[in-house]
Regions:
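Domain-level recognition of soluble alpha/beta enzyme cores
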Residues: 131-161
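Glycine-rich phosphate-binding loop signature in dinucleotide/nucleotide-binding domains
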Residues: 46-48, 104-113
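Short beta-strand scaffold positions
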Residues: 54-55, 95, 117-118
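Short active-site segment of divalent metal-dependent hydrolases/proteases
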Residues: 11, 122-123
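Active-site-proximal alpha-helix that buttresses catalytic centers in soluble enzyme cores
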Residues: 2-77, 84, 146
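Short alpha-helix plus adjacent loop in nuclease-associated cores
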Residues: 81-92
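Generic beta-sheet signal
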Residues: 3, 110-121
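Active-site signature of alpha/beta-hydrolase-fold catalytic machinery across serine-
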Residues: 66, 125-129
């Protein structure tokens, strides 16, 4: 299967909200972010996407809905794809992300394409997992650009589990 980890579109930044606080969950995407997501939706309209899974954060959900305009799928929300919570350890973030990925691998077939709309820190966690980088608060977070896709292929559960 192909799992496409997708960073949400450009968002309105709430400069008064601290990282990992509930206020950050409501950041909406900008007009530019909407246009970015629309262009991506157009590009993906002929791709046979089996499922779209998103963080429930507003910016992620909005991005997923725009991508879904040609597919008309039920969008699933999974809190394990939320960004790091206030004072959350890197190990905890990685553990919940990988648990979500493992569930996806169990649920879908080898030829399925799954879109996961998430935040940049989750993409960083997956990159660390993939390249066997020990999770640590000292590992620098990668800065994912808006709508940065990370595509990986998994042959059912044997590759991951």
């Amino acid at each position: 299967m192909k799992i496409v980890y997708m960073h949400h579109a450009e968002r309105e930044q709430n400069s008064h909200a601290a990282w990992g606080t509930p206020e950050r969950t409501f950041d909406e995407i900008t007009d530019l972010g909407r246009r970015q997501a629309e262009l991506l939706a157009e590009r993906l309209k002929n791709v046979r996407i089996k499922a779209i899974i998103t963080s429930p954060y507003t910016r992620c959900r909005s991005t997923a809905e725009i991508i879904n305009q040609y597919h008309h799928l039920d969008i699933a929300e999974d809190e394990r794809f939320n960004e790091s919570q206030k004072n959350e350890a890197w190990e905890s973030l990685l553990k919940r992300n990988m648990a979500a990925i493992e569930d996806i691998v169990r649920q879908y077939a080898d030829d399925d394409i799954i879109i996961c709309v998430t935040s940049g820190v989750n993409i960083s966690a997956f990159i660390c997992y993939t390249y066997n980088i020990t999770p640590s608060n000292d590992v620098p977070w990668t800065q994912a650009a808006d709508l940065s896709p990370v595509i990986f292929t998994i042959k059912k559960a044997k590759d991951l589990l």
